[in-house]
Amino acid sequence: MSAKEFPTTDYSKITQKYYFEYVAKRIIKIAKLQNTNKTILDFGCGQKIFSRLLKNYEIINYDIKPEYTEFESYENLHFDIVIFNHVLMYLYPSEIEKLLDKIKKLNPNCEMVLGISRQNIINRIAMILSFNPLAHKGIRSTYKEQVEIFFKKTKLIEKKSNILAMTDIFYSRFCS
């Protein structure tokens, strides 16, 4: 699957805008991002929702799609917090492990926020009702795989489950 084929949230569509802005606002609240002077890496930034919601904060936007990214690579950047919002599901489990290892090597003290699709029947119904049948095209890892890998490498700071029964949010940092 090429970079162009991965789905991107379209904030011009009212159902996607409402839901994903709500998830982004919950991420901001859980990780207390509205009160930070830390540099935030929005990994898989898409249409840069966090830059819009957190004006006047230092947000680094990185995406596999050239039209969205501000940097060719995240590997030479300095950041304190990484947001993975509905992103890891497009990586194979081995790629998630490698990514987290790279992030830890770059900053072993960074915090991470994971917004993760529960990939359940409610998500599928929402895809249909929002006229977005390709929303989960290209998924390479299950909810369970993502959570297992994430918590093998990190420890939980805070969790918010069940955002409309479709998304879980985990705020964590690397294990020692």
State what each model feature region is.
Residues M1-T39, F43-Y74, L91, V113-S176:
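Class I (Rossmann-like) S-adenosyl-L-methionine-dependent methyltransferase catalytic domain
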Residues I83:
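A conserved beta-strand element that flanks and buttresses the S-adenosyl-L-methionine
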Residues H86-Y90:
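Short catalytic micro-motifs in class I SAM-dependent methyltransferases
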Residues Y92-I96:
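Short N-terminal helix/helix-N-cap motif within the alpha/beta-hydrolase-1
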Residues E97-C110:
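A short glycine-rich, Lys/Arg-flanked "PGG" loop and its adjoining helix->strand segment in the class I
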